[in-house]
Design a protein with these regions (language model features):
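Extracellular/periplasmic helix-loop-helix junction of adjacent transmembrane segments
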Residues: 19-48
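Helix-breaking motifs and short loop linkers at transmembrane-helix boundaries and internal kinks
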Residues: 29, 61, 82-88, 99, ...
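Conserved MFS/SLC helix-loop-helix module at the cytosolic interface between two early adjacent transmembrane helices
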Residues: 47-87
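Structural signature of the two symmetry-related core transmembrane helices
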Residues: 64-78, 159, 268-283
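Paired small-residue
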Residues: 72-79, 87-95, 297-303
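Helix-loop-helix hairpin linking two adjacent transmembrane segments in secondary transporters
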Residues: 88, 117-118, 122-171, 177
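Cytoplasmic helix-loop-helix junction between adjacent transmembrane helices
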Residues: 92-133
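Juxtamembrane intracellular "pre-TM" segments in multi-pass secondary transporters
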Residues: 174-206
Length: 392
């Protein structure tokens, strides 16, 4: 259930990728790259929303916070469905993201309520496996809808999926935060919790690393349709190539779930970051030598490797960032999610809007984020760990 709720985020992002150009033309986008904002504004809503639902879930319980989020998502889906210009569409997408922040944030707290350490990393990896399987089929779903209906039918499908998922959640999931563990809502408490999260070296460092990973990934997502459908002229075959790459992340998450109990979160993350950074540096030099137009098979090979490494790191970094925050799991997940998304959205928009008919901006994004992740994680791992709070 957690995986499928999380997958609604992926479905809302990826199902309309094949339709971005058509949506932009119908709604009066002034430039081709402006259509990318349909993806970016959902992430912007996610960033702002996560700062709300964590504290709310600590006060009212996990389920009421999710109910509020789904309500906003359904309103945003309806607004996007009926949009007649790009600004209205972007408003609807922002509301969708604002609503989807609830399952994205609160799910981490729900899992942390019941698991910790490698066990939590294992659960999160399996959640990510299904979460990534959805992007493998979402563009195909969107392309299939476009073959038989208008692009607005994609948003009608999202509206229906939201209603079904909300009903399943309401009927089947018990509340995981008991009444005695709930904390009264207080701005002072929120401020103290934010300070604690941001001053804890481990949580802050791994959260920044998550933001850097997401930056490169958002830049890739924003320009994937232009790269594959236009630059490589794949047309309706775009969903197939996108699915192959999405499955690389999903398979990595599955593999990580199998290996993390044996090798540990830090070791798997450390080797994945090193390997992906070296590969990115080498491929960037190769891309420059081709004028930003590498053969499709080399581009696919590189992306398969880099996304597999990112899939290994993502679940582990989430778990390691949350490890010291068990006593403030709700707001801890909120701050972690909001901070990482606020890092990724502007950087991802910059990468996507830099698309110039070559893959240089996207590969640059992966290379630069890889180097920065190495620096940040080295800073985290070489400084002695801080003592764990007695309340943890």
């Amino acid at each position: 259930m957690m995986a499928l709720m999380q997958s609604l985020v992926a479905l809302s992002i990826d199902a309309m990728l094949p339709a971005l150009t058509e949506i932009g033309q119908d709604l009066g986008a002034r430039a081709a790259n402006d259509s990318q904002l349909i993806v970016s504004f959902l992430f912007l809503g996610l960033a702002f929303g996560q700062g709300v639902y964590g504290p709310l879930s600590d006060t009212t319980g996990r389920k009421p916070a999710v109910y509020l989020g789904f309500t906003l998502f359904l309103v945003g889906s309806l607004l996007s469905l009926l949009a007649t210009d790009l600004n209205v569409m972007l408003g609807g997408r922002f509301l969708q993201g604002l609503g989807l922040a609830a399952p994205r944030c609160v799910i981490v707290a729900i899992v942390r309520d019941q698991y910790e350490g490698p066990a939590m990393a294992r659960v999160m990896s399996f959640v990510m496996t299904i979460f990534i399987f959805v992007p493998a089929i979402a563009p195909t779903l969107g392309q299939g809808i476009l073959l038989i209906a208008h692009w607005r039918a994609i948003f009608a499908t999202l509206l229906g999926c939201g209603l079904l998922t909300l009903a399943w959640f309401a009927l089947r999931l018990p509340e995981t935060l008991s009444v005695e563990r709930r904390i009264p809502f207080s701005l002072a408490r929120i401020k103290a919790a934010v300070i604690e999260v941001c001053s804890h070296r481990v949580s802050l460092g791994y959260t920044i690393s998550l933001g850097l990973i997401s930056s490169a990934f958002l830049g890739y997502l924003s320009s994937a349709q232009q790269i594959f459908q236009k630059q490589y002229q794949l047309g309706t075959m775009f969903p197939l190539y996108f699915a192959i790459l999405a499955l690389c992340i999903g398979s990595a998450s599955f593999v990580n779930g199998r290996l993390v109990m044996r090798f540990g979160m830090q070791n798997l993350s450390r080797w994945s970051k090193r390997f992906s950074t070296v590969i990115s540096l080498l491929f960037f030099l190769y891309v420059l030598s081709t004028g930003g137009q590498p053969p499709l098979w080399t581009m696919m090979g590189y992306m398969m490797i880099i996304l597999f490494c990112f899939g290994i790191m993502y679940g582990n970094l989430n778990a390691m960032a949350m490890e010291p925050l068990g006593h403030i799991a709700g707001i801890g997940a909120a701050v972690m999610g909001a901070l990482s998304t606020l890092i990724s959205v502007p950087c991802g928009i910059l990468i996507g809007h830099s698309y110039n008919g070559t893959v240089i901006p996207v590969i640059s994004g992966f290379m630069i984020s890889g180097v920065l992740i190495v620096v940040v994680m080295h800073w985290v791992e070489t400084v002695p760990s801080e003592p764990v709070s007695e309340t943890d």
